[in-house]
Swiss-Prot record:
Name of the featured protein: Adenosylcobinamide-GDP ribazoletransferase
Source organism of this protein record: Caldanaerobacter subterraneus subsp. tengcongensis (strain DSM 15242 / JCM 11007 / NBRC 100824 / MB4)
GO cellular component, one term: plasma membrane
Names of required cofactors: Mg(2+)
Key words of the record: Cell membrane, Cobalamin biosynthesis, Magnesium, Membrane, Transferase, Transmembrane, Transmembrane helix
Amino acid sequence: MEELKALILSIQFMTGIPIPINIDVKEDKIYKIASYFPVVGLLIGGILYIAYLLLKDLFSREIVMTFLVAFSYILTRGMHIDGLADTFDGLFSNKDREKIIEIMKDSRLGTNGVLALVFMVILKILFLSDIRQSLLFSALLVSPVIARLSVVFSIAISKSARGGKGLGGLLLERAGLREFVIALLISTIAGYFVMPLKDLALLYVISLSFTCLISKYISKKIGGMTGDTLGAVNEFVELIAFIYFSIL
């Protein structure tokens, strides 16, 4: 029952998909939702593929992919792309640790954040449009899964830069190897049915290696990770997955 609660909470937390159920979970148990982030990715990927099937005969491929990228942000309430923008505003402000974190918490968007947001959206559309038709189903399902697996990996290898404040901080302080192993198992099962294992394994190596590097870089700058920087990891790895599928 605890695991089912964690699954529902992870969907409620990571998406705007309405689930009219009030889940009562103790604060010291809420970290378990991290295990099910890849399930959220699979759900989002499935919805995006259905949207693709509905739109593909109505518009050009580029327009359809633009709709899909926009719809993905609607599904997630812009949570991850907002984190990416805040991360760039903070990291490229050339300020000290405390000021960087303060800038990230600021709801106002700066020039660096706008540039990161715009380029991320454009690159996602371009590489998604470049993926072969035969690989599109796999790309739309697996990319959101791998992105969220990478977030769990970052959580497992990092600490909170804000002393455990906020849900992101709580996850960073409490979730660890157990949650990553469960997330990895879920991701592997999902990926096994839609792409060759050798291709999936290589995508794991690329994505998790990048996640390790960027997590260490950010942690060196601000002493850990935050909810915003985890969102940035999600965005970068999803783009990496799109690039990977466009090359296959």
